[in-house]
Amino acid sequence: MQLVQQLVDALSLAAVYLTIALGISIIYGLTRLVNFAQGQILLLGSFLAYSFVRAGLPLVWCIVLATLAVAIIGEILDLLLFRRTLSSPLRGFVISLGLIIIIEQASVLIWGQNVISVSTPFTTHVFNLHGVLFSAPLLLLVVTMIVLLTILFFLFERTKVGRGTQALSENRATAQLMGIPVGRYISFTFLVGSAIAGLGGAIFALMYPFDAFSGTQYVLIAFAIAIIGGLGSITGCVVASLLLAIPQSLASAYISISWAPAFGLIVATLIILFRPNGIFKSAGTGGASHFALGDFSDRLHASEIRLAAAIKASRVNSVRRRLQQWGMERYGIWCAFVLLGLAPVILRSDSSLSIATYMVILAIAGVGFWLTFRQAGVFSVASGALMGVGGYMAAYLLDRFNVNFWLQLPAAAAAAGAVALVIGVIAIRTSASYFVILTLMLSELIILLFTNFTSVTNGSIGLVDSAPPSSLGPINFGGADAFYYLAFCLLAATTLFVFGVCRSRFGRRLISIRENTELARSLGVNVLRDKIAVFTLFGAISGVAGVMLFYYLHYITPATYDVPLTLDIVLIVLLGGATVWLGPMVGAAIFAFLPSLLSLSPVVAQLVYGCCLVAVIILMPTGVVGKFKGLYISLWFRLHATTKGVVDSAPNMSSFADPIENTESNQVS
C-alpha cells in the first residue's frame, strides 16, 4: 500500500513538472528559446493565486485570474524582450537568466521571503480510497491536466493553428515563404505556454509550500522532460514526466529524501546523453541551437579589422602607428591594474577596501568564464559549483589537517580542475543548449553533494574558520590591506596566465574552433580534446576564486556556491564585455560597488543586477567596455583616418548599440 501511495505522490510531482515542461516544449519547439525563467513564471501563478485567496475571492476565480494574469505577463515578456533575440538564442537564454533574478527578487519585495502555504477548506480535504490518500488539490491538478492535454492534443493535431505551429517548428524560413504569420504564432505559443505555467502554479500553491526561490529546483527537470519527450510532443512530455518523477518519489520514500532530487537529475542526464532526440516526436534541432560569441561581438570585430587596415594604410608616423596598433584596450588594462594596485591608498575606509577585495575575487572567477567563452565559444554555467569545489577543498584541508594556505591553493585548483574535466567529458560533446542544461544539472548534483556529505562538509551548516591565509615569509595576510594585495596578485597572475593561453598555439586552435568547428575539425584540430582542456583550465581558475571567497567570508555553505553565484559571474562578464580583456574587471567593479554607491539593500541590489543584465543584452550586447571600445574605433576613424577611402568605410557610432542585425526578429515583430 505504501508503494501505491508513493506512486500517487509521484503522479502529483509529474503533474507539476508537466505544467512547466509543456510550456517549455511549445515555446522552445517554435522559437529555440532556452527560457530558464519558466519555473519563476509558474511561481508567479502561485503568488497571484495566494494573493487572490487572501483577498477573499472564490477559489475558482483565483485560479482563473492567476492563469490569465500570467499569460498576459508571458506575452509582454515575449514582445518586449524575447522577440528581439530570435536569431541569437544565447542572448535569449541570458535574458531568461536575468528574468530569474528579477522575478525572484520582485517576489521577495512584494510577498516576502518566508515559505508560504495556502490554506482553505478545499486544500485540507483528503479522500481515502482503500488506504490510499488523495488530496483534493491533487485530484484537481490531475483532472485539469487530463482536460488540458486533451485540448492541446486537439489544438496541435487537428487545427490549422496547430499545423502552422508544427510547420514553423520544423522549418521557419519555409513556413514564412508559405505565408504563415510568424509573429502571431509566436505570440500564440507564449500565451499558451505561460497560461499553462500560470494554471499549474495556481494549483501548485494549493498543494505545496513555496517561496520566491522554489522555481529553480523544478525548471531543470522540466526542461529535461521537454527534450526527453521530444520537442512538440505532448505524449512524450507526459511519459517523460512520469519517467523522471517516479524514481525521484520512490527514492524519497525508500532511500533518502535529501538525495531524492539527485535521482531525477541523474536520470535526466543519462537520457539526454543517450537519447538526445527524445522518446517520441522531436523537432530534430532542439539541441542544436547555436550559442555563439558572435551574438555579442560581430560588428565590433568587423570594425576592429577595418581599424587595423586603416592604421596600416594611414599616413601617421611610425611611432604613432605603433601606439595606435597597441590599442586602447591594452592601455586600459595597464591603467586598471595601476588603479587596483593603488586601491588601498585611494579607498581610505575599511568597508570600501572590503568591497574592492570582493570585486577582485569575482574578477578572478570572471576571467575563467571569459576564457572559455571568448576563446572557445563555450558558454559555461558551472562557475558557482566549481568555485565551491575549490572552497570546500581549502576549508576541509584547513579544518581537518591544518594545511598551509599555499598548499591549499594548488590542491583546490587541481580538485576543481578535475571536477571540470569530468563535467567536460560528460557534457561538452553535446550541442549548445544541451550543454547548458547538462552543466546546470551536474552543478546542482555537486551542490547536493555539498549538502548531504555532512561528515566532510558539515551539511547546510557549513564550515567556519576565521584564520587568515598563511604568512609568506615576513608578509602576514591578517590585515585588510595585505589580504587585498594577495587577491590582487592572484588576479594579475590569472590574467597573465590567460593572456599566455590566448597567445599560444592552443589558444589559436580554440579560436578556430570558436569560429568554425567543422572547418577546424577538417584541418586536424581535436575539437573535443581542446574544449575539454579549456574547460578544465576554467575549473582550476574557478577553484582559486572559490578559495579566496572562503577566506574572504570566513565561512562556507552549499548556498554560498549555488546557482545565484553562477548567475552573478555571467552577469559580471557580460556587463563588462564578453569579448574584451577589461570586461571581467569592469563588470566586477560595477557589480561590487553599485549597491554601496546607491545605498541599495541586498534584495534591491539583486533586482537591479537582473535589470542590468537584461538591459545590457537588449541595448548594448558588447557590454560597457565593448560599447566604449566601439565608440573609440568610430572616433579614431573620424579623427585620424586620412587615407583616401578609409573615412568612407568608418563604422556608424550607433551600430555599436546592437552588434547583431536581427533581421528575423524584425520580420516577425
Q: PLM features: residue spans?
A:
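Short, hydrophobic transmembrane alpha-helix segments
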Residues: Q2-Q5, S25-V34, Y50-C62, R83, ...
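Interhelical loop and adjacent transmembrane-helix boundary motif
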Residues: Q2-Q6, L48, A205, I225-I227, ...
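Transmembrane alpha-helices
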Residues: A14-G23, Q176, I180-F204, T216, ...
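Short, non-helical or kinked segments that cap or interrupt transmembrane helices
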Residues: A15, I24-S46, S87-G92, V161-G164, ...
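Transmembrane alpha-helices and adjacent helix-loop boundaries
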Residues: V16, L90-V94, G98-N114, H130, ...
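Hydrophobic alpha-helical segments within and immediately flanking transmembrane helices
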Residues: V16-I26, V34-R54, I73, L77, ...
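Mid-bilayer segments of alpha-helical transmembrane spans in multi-pass integral membrane proteins
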Residues: A71-I72, I76, S96-N114, F134, ...
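Membrane-helix/interface signature in polytopic inner-membrane proteins
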Residues: I151-F190, M207, G215, L496-V534, ...
